[in-house]
Amino acid sequence: MVLLGALAAWLWGAKKLPVRILTIASLSVLVIFVGYSSYALLLIRSHANPPMNQNAPDNVFSLGSYLSREQYGETPLLYGHTFKSSVMYQLQPDGYNYDILRRPGKTVYKKGVKTSPDQADSYVAKQEEFKYEMTPKMLFPRMYSTAGAHPQAYLEWINATEDDLPSVETPVVVDADGNTVQSMAMKRPSYLQNLRYFFNYQVNYMYWRYFMWNFAGRQNDLAGEGQANRGNWISGIPVIDNYRLGDQSLLPDEYGKGNKGHNVFYMLPLLMGIIGLCWQAFRSKRGIEQFWVIFFFFFMTGLAIVLYLNQPPLQPRERDYAFAGSFYAFAIWVGMGVAGLWTLVNWLMGNPEAVRDGKSLPKNGKADPAKSHKTALAMACVTLAVGLLVPFQMVSQTWDDHDRSGRYTTRDFGMNYLSSIAPNGIIFTNGDNDTFPLWYAQEVEGYRTDVRVVNLSYLTTDWYANQMKVATDGAAGLKFSAQPADYAYDRLQFSYYDPENMVTDTVNVFTSLDDLYHNPDATWKGARVMRMPYMYIPSNAEAAVKAGVISERELPAAEETIDIALYRDPKNPVGGATLSQALSIDMIATQAKEGWNRPAYFAMTVPDEYYLSLSPYMRNTGLAYQVSPLLNPDGSNETWIDTDKMYANVTEKFRWGGLDKLGKDGDIYLDETVRRMVTTHRTAMADLAMACLLYTSPSPRD
């Protein structure tokens, strides 16, 4: 409406305008509206409530949050903290005590929780979490993340140690007016070190390396983090590659020429692109105008994205796909390189007028037949060489690592996860590679739609928890005691442990969860507190037998309770419980209470810290661990194997994605991600084989 109003006012004020300007204005507005109308698809799809409905953008506020990527947090761009910054403190009015300096977050609107289906929609104003004031800060902060191993990785990329970082005098305590009360010297990267990381990692390694993959060559398909033997760009010219990376002929075959991701273009596409770029830029006034159009396309989809993303090191996967638009732009210049070569050959053949004027005739208008024939022959050779040799070289190098024929590993391995689950079961997953293949198998192939896939990363959000209660095609909604009002508005995002007021007795799981959800006293400075982290789930063992979770002969060995100890869990030593942990415990306990009709599993690839201290109660049935009322028979705190179920699943239900087909070694391309999936299967097979050797009877409980 604002855009239309501004356009109407402008047209009214300028009553006499050329038709050309009116046409451009109307077409521009039309194109803008067509572009923005694509966002309507998100709202329409979300209102249909499909099984996969990320962020549930069914209203303007959640749509805004979705488009601004708020779930990924904020990244400092122009001014902000570094990885050496710490929180500032504010002096209290009494003049003695301090408190952490926090700034109130912005007010956001969220969809109100309905207490009945016929209640009208409402929107609630909520203040975002307080933002802690950090010190020291710097301009253009590139090294800011304190997560995991990021601080050490920053230092490695700038070839420095903690001692090499300079100290700056910075305020650490301020009064209510912002005046410095106390300052101290604190470490902070220098601006030179900051720029060194920016160019070494973000620009060179995370952009130009990918650029050179496409126009110079690639060492192998292994994800790298700066190593000389993983994922670098190469040219195929030994004098260049050996100087940069060491003697490439000494690499093991799987790291060098034996790796299908090993591609060499001898920099021919790069040279063609540079020639095309120069030809367009210096051709004429029209050429330079067109050059700037392509250049901004190249820059805004390449280096501008580098500036915006501000990527920390140790990325979980290669990010070359983020810059595909930039590579498309350079490919335009590669095509123009043919015309540039035509001009270059004309100049070399002694026809400078053609270079300047773009014509084949000299200025006097008289053509030299011999020279024209010679030029035409040379140009035919150049066109043939460029038009065939360079593309053929690229195709011959990249065909084998782009050919996916005969490879169905992603589909089949996703089905194998689902095949490990009993009917109507629940499987908890965590990462992309153990979630999206399962969703594909269910939604596209229609395979095992009775299984409910629960992604633990998404389960930290209220919109995903709400979706878990909704039935999908083939699977009923999940039952758990928490209601939308209990976890709405990030209320249970993180519940702290309070050792001083903690209940150390082991209580019923629903007593603990009810206290967390509803007890008004279970708070600390506005945040929820889990006061009862030691809990038990009644095993309901006889119902587990009827549901097929355990066998009749295993019933005498079943435990009366399944014990959970979240606090001081050695595999997850954190200071509180997440919403994901609370809801996953709730789901497991509820299905056990209701007769184990929806047995719970954890995908084999889920890290141990997500197991809720249930490891000794979990048995491998293929590619998933089933929660059962049986403890590990060897008395350890680790998972174990249900040999009966796993053997049946592996031998009767598993698929192998084409890897079981007869053919020459290397017929099917297996990139690093697929090879990791294959390794997961191999590990499962080895564990099963070892279990079968250890237990001579059909079941270890016999």
Identify the function of each model-found stretch.
Residues M1-E318, A322-F323, F330-N424, W439-S697, ...:
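ER/secretory pathway lumenal C-terminal domains and tails of membrane proteins involved
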Residues F436:
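Residues that form or flank phosphate/diphosphate-binding pockets in enzymes
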